[in-house]
Amino acid sequence: MNTTERTMAAATLRLEDSRVTGPDSLRVSRLPAADKGGKWEICGICDGIEPAAFNRLKALLDAGKREEAWEGCLQYVLDNTAAVRSWLGSDAYPGVEFILRDHFFNSGSRNTGKILQRALNVHGAGLTVDGIPGKQTRQ
């Protein structure tokens, strides 16, 4: 994980829980009753959607391994949004990459792919908006 990726992942985590600024403030939060992600989360990593990741991170926090839990959260965000880099074809546009990664983390691949395709179509790309970025999207 390079410095730019680390910064992007940390910003995504902060957007998920504004009280978290790093390992010392990392916490388990109760989700609202209407939330479909489960009952608990750690910076958007929910027990109902990603139980294995949530349980691993919670166990680290319970054991007092805050730094390791923070690194695990950062890596989780990067691993789960890695497709965005392949869509863009490089790391040359970190601002665009960040916005797409953050959206991907919250809305998934297909919705984020559609946003990218629609944005490119505004500039004349003529892409089919199917949410599956491929070779034409990268061009």
How would you describe each model-predicted region?
Residues 1-139:
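Cell-wall polysaccharide-cleaving catalytic domain and substrate-binding groove, primarily
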